[in-house]
Amino acid sequence: MLPEPVPVVAAGWCGRLRRQQLVAVLMLPLASLAHAAFPDFSQVRAAHRPSEAVWLDRHGQPLQVSRIDRSVRRLAWVPLRQIAPVLQGAVIASEDQRFAEHSGVDWQAAAGALVERLQGSPRGASTLSMQLAGLLDADLKPGSDGRSVLQKLAQVSAARGLEQRWSKAQILEAYLNLAPFRGELQGIGAAAAGLFGKQPHGLNQGEAILLAALLRGPNAAADVVARRSCELAAQLKARVGCAYLQGLGAQALAARSNLADIVLAPELPALLPL
């Protein structure tokens, strides 16, 4: 009896995977060298610049805000202790459920993503550390077809390097300050102020879930954001329902607050650049 033929699609995938694995092995030393001098957390935080400059009177009180960076809207760096724990938990649940356990790469999630890709349903498996590496290094920015094999390898190497030099708290803090949330809003300070008129420490559970849901697709349509928010709320066993999240999202995404007004608000001093 003749053996059953191997499906062409499976064989093609196996061949591509073997080639990618070979490239990964050959390029690993280069990727490691490229990220040996990755910046310290203190350097990244010190280099952070708000997109708004605040003019003060002779008594040190804010008078006027001028935008100095037209590419993004970004407020002052927000320490992790000033970010609502409910938001931190929602982001970890949405983006990296084993954040506290892995060393930069979640191999379990990566294996699951590979299986789904073979089945024709691709999904991401990037950890918060990997995403942060992509935000810190312009060379890791994905192209129109996503990241190349070499970029993915370098991203893995960079994430592992970050985990060796930074604490988990520093990784989470930097990610929340650098990640794009919606349109030109970058970082949790601008996102909380621009969408909800709040400081990050004042976010409630519904707002936290909505912001976490935005991270996977900052410019996704409102109905997509609502669906992701509903799924995340169910995952977290949250006290808020889908109808509430849908209404909250529609309102926040349609009517964005004026960041200049937020920065000048006397009850929001933590948003002023140091």
Language model: regions and residue ranges:
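N-terminal type II signal-anchor transmembrane helix
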Residues: 2-5, 12-58, 63, 98, ...
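Coil-to-alpha-helix initiation sites in intrinsically disordered, low-complexity, charged segments
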Residues: 11-12, 148
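N-terminal post-signal-peptidase region of extra-cytosolic proteins
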Residues: 38-41, 71-80, 94, 156-157
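Short Gly/Pro-enriched turn/cap motifs at secondary-structure boundaries
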Residues: 43-45, 123, 151
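Flexible, acidic/glycine-enriched loop-and-adjacent beta/alpha segments
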Residues: 47, 79-131, 186-191, 196, ...
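Solvent-exposed coil/turn segments that connect beta secondary-structure elements
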Residues: 49, 58-61, 68, 83-86, ...
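N-terminal periplasmic "start-of-domain" segments of outer-membrane beta-barrel proteins
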Residues: 61-74, 108-115, 151-152
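Non-catalytic, structured segments within soluble enzyme domains
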Residues: 125-274
